[in-house]
Amino acid sequence: MDKLLIFGGLPLKGEVTISGAKNAALPIMASTLLAQGVHIFKRIPKLRDVFTMTELIKRMGGIVEFNELCKINTIKINKFEASYDLVKTMRASILVLGPLVARFGRAKVSLPGGCAIGARPVNLHINGLQKMGAKISLQEGYIIAKASRLMGTKIYFDIPTVTGTENLMMAATLAKGTTIIENAAKEPEIVDLANYLILMGAKIEGAGTSIIKVEGVDELKPPQEYEIIPDRIETGTFIAIAGACGGDISLKGCRIDHIDAIILKMKDAGISFKEIENGIRVIGPKRLQAVDIKTMPYPGFPTDMQAQFMAMMTVANGTSVIKETIFENRFMHVAELRRMGADITVEGNTATIRGVKKLKGAPVMATDLRASASLVIAGLIAEEETLIDRIYHLDRGYEELDKKLIQLGARIQRIK
């Protein structure tokens, strides 16, 4: 199992190209099951979760080529199962459920695994598909779904759900009639998925708002080559790295219109930004200022940036308060940051961080994807060596993060 050895305390300077968004790539890859033919993508990141989705599609009969471009051939899809051994490693595997039921009238998908950061129930997906006419049962840990043809309906989410919105939007594209999804999630990744579905011939209005309207069509067809949006969480993570290290980093290929809340809070912490061609330049201060945040659905401050922001705040001037409102059990990185000298207390969904002048390197363990990124940030600003175990979590969501950091001047070694 790989580990990362980080020698902290070095200034980071240079240029980084932001990878394609994992959370856009995964649903768009799942959407290829809706349309027979060859789908061609630019900027799909080479990540553990992407390779899991690739294997899922291959086992169903798809052919996937992964070079500079990603090509997915769905002509010979003849199996409709997502097995436990793959789904347990990635919750986003549930995204094949809607497309399979919509196009083939059946699906067998294992209940999800993936991050250990909360229940993330799939009942919203199941309830929505049932409203569209699917017959669904749970058998031995699998969701078994059948439908002759899904029917358009009105669906209301009690709470906005990103994967639920994506799954039901995909399913609705081939349903008979009109589907309206109310209290839909608004994330940019949902808009990117909708844009790809529209290019395939889907009729979708309102993606990126709380009400999405989908008029079903009889058939979808693969469009020309499509480019995935840049990863806003990777962008935010590198902003946090620049801020924490007092760095000067240019981020190329990012979309600043996707990260308004992140940029506003980073500015409050003392980080400076300059727009450059096709990106932004991020300049960290001599010392960060403490800032409070509350995680919220998009366009609020993203829960996927909470751990990285906390790592910054461990060495900020003053006391900051972080409220986590999206997922329970998402402060698992706190114990590891404390091992490095951070002064953090947690009560319920609220963490209070009293900034210290220095962190000290220590052996620590990654518990989930974004927690692993927070430990990398802590390691970069700490004195002496930090050894991070279980970095397979990091590889699930960041494309060659260690190599990108080395380009900026970090001393990092991957240990097998």
Swiss-Prot record:
Keyword Iron in annotation: no
Catalyzed reactions per annotation: phosphoenolpyruvate + UDP-N-acetyl-alpha-D-glucosamine = UDP-N-acetyl-3-O-(1-carboxyvinyl)-alpha-D-glucosamine + phosphate
This protein's UniProt keywords: Cell cycle, Cell division, Cell shape, Cell wall biogenesis/degradation, Cytoplasm, Peptidoglycan synthesis, Pyruvate, Transferase
GO BP annotation list: cell division; cell wall organization; peptidoglycan biosynthetic process; regulation of cell shape; UDP-N-acetylgalactosamine biosynthetic process
Gene Ontology cellular component list: cytoplasm
Keyword Transcription regulation recorded: no
Signal peptide limits: none
Top-tier EC class: transferase
Name of this protein: UDP-N-acetylglucosamine 1-carboxyvinyltransferase
Primary location recorded for the protein, binned into one broad class: cytoplasm
UniProt modified residues of type 2-(S-cysteinyl)pyruvic acid O-phosphothioketal: C115
Entry-linked Pfam families: EPSP_synthase
Subcellular location(s) per record: Cytoplasm
Binding positions (phosphoenolpyruvate): K22, N23
Sequence similarity: Belongs to the EPSP synthase family. MurA subfamily.
